Amino acid sequence: MCEKTTNVPDLFGKMVFGEQQMQQRLPAAAYQKWQQCLAQGTPLDRTTAGEIANAMKDWAIEKGATHYTHWFQPMTGVTAEKHDSFITRDGKDGVVMELSAKELSKGEADASSFPSGGLRATFEARGYTAWDPTSYAFVKDETLYIPTIFCSYSGQTLDKKTPLLRSMRVLDRECIRILRLFGNTEAQHVTPQVGPEQEYFLIDEKVYRQREDLKLCGRTLFGARPSKGQELDDHYYGAIKPRVAAFMRELDQELWKLGVLAKTEHNEVAPAQHEIAPIYSDANSACDKNQLTMELLKKVAARHGLVCLLHEKPFAGVNGSGKHDNWSLATDTGENLLKPGSTPSQNAQFLLFLAAFIKGVDEYQEMLRCCVSYPGNDHRLGGNEAPPAIISIFLGDELTAILDAIIQGTEYVDITKKKLTIGVDTLPEIPQDTTDRNRTSPLAFTGNKFEFRMLGSSQSIASPNVVLNTIMAEELRQFADILEKADDFQSALQKLLHDTFTAHQRIIFNGNGYDDAWVQEAKRRGLANLRDTVDCMPAYIDKKNVDLFTKHAILTETEMRARYEIHLENYCKVSAIEASTLLDMVQRHILPAASAYADRLTQTAFHKENSVPALSARMEKTLAQRVTDLGEKLFDTCEALHAALSDAPAADGGIDAARYYRCEIVTRTQKAGELIGRLESLVDAKAWPYPTYADILFSV
């Protein structure tokens, strides 16, 4: 629970076995070997691993832990864990508390019980977890959590962390090659830095428990638009309600204890919608901590009689929830490689990294779109509340003008009338507020980072960052190959920047992404417009993308195909669950309520006409007819939906099954939801069986 007085520096990282704890508790030699392991990627010997395991166990027991778990991130998108106690026989009918080097380093899990895309059959159940020493262990709920990767018996990747770690390693290598070309010999490592802004909804637990769709699907499948939504713009940055503020205070403290750099909280645009944003950390740590954040959002909410909804579109008619992935590159000497430089060399270096990013996004736009595609996000992307489904980059007017000057071979003149020659002069300072105004862009440069805005609120940030890291590494590799062979570095650099910006300027768009004209303009430019998950998934097995990930040993072709199959199967299963839930709600509650209300209206009309012949019953008859007509349309739609479900192919039927579900199941589920919303607006509130949007959104 929330501590009344908080000394944040003392509280922060209290439940984390971090570097400070290691330095205090490990023998000096073991501590040095651990640091060497992190710096060079060398494996730990069994003796050192045993010393770390023993120190970790002793510390965890002091924090109240009795169990440990290998904490991993399978392809479900959420974390998984199996708890084992520290106890072992002491040989005298008692027990002692132990954690061996083997128990720290390696665990076993039933790989066939997690999504594997055919990599693991039920009779090939064995899978392994392996300790990730780059991510700190922590204690939560009297259990020591050890971050791990997850793979099959034969070594095939079954999780989201392993590709992320590999992509970071490849990106590090290629960034260093570029830095050496610019004379930087001090930096030894470059790490992608990530800060995910997490959006969510908070509603009262009582109304949540009255909606089967929220409980089973995480979102409402129907609802009439409330009289007041977000039209007045009064919720965004508005005063935080006391109950929500109490929740946020406790959430902060729980996150701080676990080393999560929770920094900013505020109300979002939609009623009951909020956001929490952390300080940046390396991509691997940021991914782990975002998973912890999502878990604690739900747990802390429950302690306050609230429910946290992480679905991308829990309510129709108001904004859904996303997760902005702020991505940058930092050296171990503290330099941000995406920050415009203050010297001629840094100026050219920044433009080269910018060119690599632009080229990568243009060449692999389908893969970027694919990595944020799943059923929940299909309801959000492309609406006038979230980035469009078309990938583009927003740079702002000043930076775009600099690129135009490079493309046209002219001198750039800044607002002070100073001319700019690339590699000779410094870039003018680009005020952040001039590059952070376009909220309709899926990828925006915001002064010293790129903000990838297409992520859904419930998804792991691992896959999007794997794609960003890998495409950046590939383009930097190509650039380094060219520049390392150049006789005249400056001339080669000038030509490379000119050619790259010229070839890939089509991906830059500073306009309104919500405008219908952009769809036509994007088509003219040859940009991909992949509208939903089913359209996106073939990108996973496109030869260009398979070659990219196999070339850098991020994923094998088999692992890419497995992910393709997993996502398609998930699409079918989610669609079936939502359709079945809606059918149950309609048949058992909504149609009976509508029928009973129509009957009541007709009885009232009958009594009025028979008791006082001059008394009009037009209102009752009209309402009864409208309710009956809508009820029959809903009944027919649900009958067709039920038949479509009965005829549906198996969920693991690949792209053909997914197309069937999109055409026959999803469209009918949506149509039924619209009809229910119209019925809800007609039926007596006392007779309607479920809380309305107004009841839910304004319940806190």
PLM region descriptions:
Residues G77-D93, S112, R211, G218-T220, ...:
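Short linear, low-complexity motifs centered on an aromatic residue
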Residues D10-E124:
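Active-site core of metal-dependent hydrolases
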Residues T47, H67-H70, H266-E268, H324-N326:
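Histidine-centered active-site/metal-ligand motif
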Residues M1, T5-Q20, R169, R173, ...:
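Flexible inter-domain linker/hinge segments
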Residues T48-I52, F72-P74, K102-E103, F150, ...:
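Active-site-proximal loop/turn and secondary-structure-junction residues that shape catalytic pockets
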Residues A65, T69-Q73, K289-R303, L329, ...:
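Hydrophobic/aromatic-rich, well-ordered segments within soluble, folded domains that form packed cores
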Residues L497-V700:
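C-terminal amphipathic alpha-helical interaction region
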Residues E124-L310, N319-G322, L329-E565:
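Glycine-rich, acidic/polar active-site loops that bind/position phosphate-bearing ligands
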